[in-house]
Amino acid sequence: MPSPLILCRYLPRELSPTVDSRSCSSPLVASRAGKFLGATPPRAPRLSRRLAWCFIDWGQVCLLHRLGSGGFGSVYKATYHGVPVAIKQVNKCTRTLRASQRNFWAELNIARLHHDNIIRVVAASTRTPEGSNSLGTIIMEFGGNVTLHQVIYGATRSPEPLSCREQLSLGKCLKYSLDIVNGLLFLHSQSILHLDLKPANILISEKDVCKISDFGCSQKLQDLRCRPSLHHIGGTYTHQAPELLKGEIATPKADIYSFGITLWQMTTREVPYSGEPQYVQYAVVAYNLRPHWQAVFTASLTGKTLQNNVQSCWEARALQRPGAELLQKDLKAFRGALG
């Protein structure tokens, strides 16, 4: 059995798993459920209620099926103490061990935080069942089977296919946008940057609420300020702000840029770019390349209002983009004007 990290590593003050360069956002690929990692779970120690999330009561874990797998491990649907949850197992891969460790600790940047539009961490531990090839396990609330990406592009694992036209009316688009911005506003108020915001990382619950998930690229602002060398950020190139592509230090405005691309996707139901990633990245920085404006943005007054919102979010200079609070105010006013 691997030795656990010392307890002080779990304390809130020590939960500072910032990262520099790493590969992130490997899309989850659906696969058949397999046997859970081992048969002999470690015994959970007695902890105060404040620290209860730091360890997993393995006897209360019941795996249902695998939801998918990616570069850093697998995600399962399960129950924990009888409640539906998602369990992320981070692989112990020698080739990418350091990146996997960073991903694991970055996911815990949101530990002990609670917000309706943020996936909640229920429990986490570096102690894993004997014989497993995992460096850590994270139990999260189950946010739903469907992502915003699946709603936009019509692909879903749900038994009943979604109708994009029904699911993404203007009203629905604004509702989802406000959910996402509310989540960002909360994260930024806690000095946390997501840094990989995109439709595939937005879960939609059974109550039709958007929840921001996948914090494997997240960073804390104070760590970026204390250690400026941590400025080379992982993420998804189509949604990365120009300043990040240039290797500059991340700010909350980087998440706003990513939201602008996401809002464009919700409105057009198109993919942002075509072409080789390196050419797209160069053009975004050197030539201010952005996704093409579609007719939906110019055909009506509401379309033009949406265009203005998107345009403000993906401005080349971070200082020219609105903060989450102002963006929330504008979207609420827009939604209210529609009645």
Curated annotation (Swiss-Prot):
Q: Where does ATP bind?
A: L67, G68, S69, G70, G71, F72, G73, S74, V75, K88
Catalytic activity reads:
L-seryl-[protein] + ATP = O-phospho-L-seryl-[protein] + ADP + H(+); L-threonyl-[protein] + ATP = O-phospho-L-threonyl-[protein] + ADP + H(+)
Q: Which Pfam families match?
A: Pkinase
Q: Which GO terms describe its cellular component?
A: cytoplasm; cytosol
**Where, subcellularly, is it found?**
Cytoplasm
Broad EC category: transferase
Q: Which UniProt keywords apply?
A: ATP-binding, Cytoplasm, Kinase, Nucleotide-binding, Proto-oncogene, Serine/threonine-protein kinase, Transferase
Could you say which tissues express the protein in this record? Answer: Expressed mainly in gonadal tissues, and cardiac and skeletal muscles.
> What's its EC?
2.7.11.1
Q: Which family does it belong to?
A: Belongs to the protein kinase superfamily. Ser/Thr protein kinase family.
Q: What does this protein do?
A: Serine/threonine kinase involved in the regulation of MAPK signaling. Is an activator of the ERK1/2 signaling cascade playing an essential role in the stimulation of oocyte maturation.
Its name, as the record gives it, is Proto-oncogene serine/threonine-protein kinase mos
